[in-house]
Regions:
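C-terminal structural segments of small proteins and small subunits
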Residues: 42-73
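Residue-level recognition of beta-strand microenvironments
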Residues: 17, 30, 41-43
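Short alpha-helix capping/helix-loop boundary micro-motifs
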Residues: 23-26
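Conserved hydrophobic positions within beta-strands
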Residues: 14, 37-40
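Absolute protein N-terminus
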Residues: 1-2, 73
Length: 73
């Protein structure tokens, strides 16, 4: 299952990141790494971005980026 499929308020564990080296590096700097617990806080009106929370850090991801993050509930 991919991160962009989670509903608002749901949590899951990141199991893999299928992204370019540059995007993986960016994700790593935000704490988006294998084993991290991610919570979906909200979606934008057009559902082009989503706000997620990992630990105490909130961030916005494009749907295209969230499609590259595999999760397990």
């Amino acid at each position: 299952m991919m991160l962009n499929m989670l509903a608002k308020g749901q949590s899951a564990v990141i199991t893999a990141i299928n992204a370019s080296k540059e995007l993986k590096s960016r994700f790593n700097s935000f704490g988006i790494v294998k084993g991290a617990i991610v919570n979906v806080e909200q979606y934008s009106l057009a559902k082009q971005t989503m706000e997620i929370k990992i630990n105490k850090t909130r961030m916005a991801l494009r749907f295209s980026e969230a499609e590259q993050v595999e999760i397990s509930e």
